[in-house]
Amino acid sequence: MEMGAEKMLASILEPLRDRYDFVIVDTCPSLGSLTINALAAADEVMITVNPQLLAMMGLQDFIRTVKKVRNRLNESLRIAGILLTMCDARTNLCKVITEQVMEAFEGQIRIFESVIPNTVKVGESIYYSKPLVEYAPGSKVCEMYRSLAREVADYEGE
């Protein structure tokens, strides 16, 4: 990576700050250069957690990375909260990981009340190149994303 490359996205997004209330950058679940760029450019980060066996280790690693980025590249970076995604509430693993997240971070990091369920609707909407609100507007997953949007808007208004 060339020098200063971790600030490339920040310089591209800077002119947009006055035009938009929110700019959302969705990165893949890795700690590669795109994720570091997104963290260097962000005011806040919403950490998504897929309740699988290695989720807690990955969550701890990501929080450490956020702290490093805050110390080295973006001192104003804040954690907006933790969002549980791809959850199947019928499984014990989902329940256990959700409880672990609550026990480990409640009172330290906001845990969003909205929980995004695991469903084929998301993948189908991507396949058909349609926003979820058009492809499956009445679905549970769409309602949870609406709920999350309300939570974020209410949080920003505080």
Indicate where each model-derived feature is located.
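Short, flexible helix/strand-to-coil boundary loops that buttress conserved ligand/catalytic motifs
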Residues: 1, 35, 126
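Short, conserved glycine- and acidic-residue-centered signature motifs
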Residues: 2, 55-58, 141
